[in-house]
Amino acid sequence: MSAPQIPNLNTLRRGGGRGRFRARGGPDSSSSSGNKDRVVQGTDNDASVSRLSAVELGYLEDPFARALTPMGQEMRRLPIINRGTYVRTTAIDQLVASFLGLKADSDPTWKLKKKQIISLGAGSDTRVFRLLSLRPALDIIYHEIDFAVNNTAKIKAIQGTPLLQRVLGQSQVSISNEGDELHSPAYHIHAVDLRTLAQKGEGDKSTGQDPGRRLQDFVDTTLPTLLLSECCLIYLSPNDAAGVVRYFTHTLFPASQETETLALVLYEPIRPDDAFGRTMVANLATRGIQLQTLHQYASLGAQRQRLREHGFNGGQAAADVDFLWERWVAEEEKERVAALEMLDEVEEWKLLAQHYCVAWGWRKGSTRFTGWGDLDGQSAEE
């Protein structure tokens, strides 16, 4: 999942952010609100272009990237953007792999347990296809939530691409009349405005006509579940962003002794108040992009506190992209990546990478989850 220039590390210089900035549309019918939603929706193209750039240059292996990039929009990104896309993607891949029990040293019991992922603002993200291609060894249900317009584009791509259809399989796949929702045994695409979920009260499982009803119909609340938000919640107001997380932690997955593990991974920009951060925010504003929770969760410490406040008491950690490059990427792999392109802007790379972070936390469940204990987080605002 990705983000505009910004969340994808994509663009202080080229504009265009990408984003797991997605899934958030709104009940507000004003033209101003509609325009803001369209700006956020448009960041998905930037994300897919950045992903394809990194794939074609050899940073990442992703056979599905081209199928989910709009025709004619291919573009080679700057080296620092390609490296940022690489670090963000591989770091989140490591967290996902650990949660799913895909590592060689994963607990055998946990590894065999069926699990669920819910991706907020997924847009054109390819992770679902990369994971579903591991079946039947991997038993998983994958949900994506986004604006209807982004879903429609993705579903059309699936319908027109045999490669994606083969991964999904042909059995029991249904598409809504509007073409903005898809449902199958292992993969669901939901057209839901996240702000409507934020408006539901704690423990409120009423159905009515709201989109949350459809979500509740398909989400299996008995499974260990991982929530992904790659530059998605940051586009909501602080109250709505917190409300969305509460919807999952209190309404769909209320904590109890019988509750299964619930985890959350966030990818967001940070540190808006130094010189680089102020320039970043100003550049995004010229494109109509407003990061509404940026100042509330401006540091690694604030992101960790956010996770604690939402009940992720099993553990919380966070690290900026610079730290992840230095500590999570093996030296041999660093050499391989460095050989792909000449990266002259080392100082700029470090500045950019220090202004984006990955944060992760989990809530203990009836099945023990320890898969993130070996992943280093940053202990201080270095």
Swiss-Prot record:
Alphabetized GO MF terms: protein C-terminal leucine carboxyl O-methyltransferase activity
Species of the source: Emericella nidulans (strain FGSC A4 / ATCC 38163 / CBS 112.46 / NRRL 194 / M139)
Record's compositionally biased regions (Polar residues): 1-11
Gene that specifies this protein: ppm1
InterPro entries according to UniProt: LCMT1, Ppm1/Ppm2/Tcmp, SAM-dependent_MTases_sf
Catalytic activity: [phosphatase 2A protein]-C-terminal L-leucine + S-adenosyl-L-methionine = [phosphatase 2A protein]-C-terminal L-leucine methyl ester + S-adenosyl-L-homocysteine
Region (Disordered) location: 1-45
Full protein name: Leucine carboxyl methyltransferase 1
PANTHER family: LEUCINE CARBOXYL METHYLTRANSFERASE, LEUCINE CARBOXYL METHYLTRANSFERASE 1
EC number: 2.1.1.233
SUPFAM superfamilies referenced in this protein's UniProt entry, alphabetically: S-adenosyl-L-methionine-dependent methyltransferases
Keywords, ordered alphabetically: Methyltransferase, S-adenosyl-L-methionine, Transferase
Family according to the record: Belongs to the methyltransferase superfamily. LCMT family.
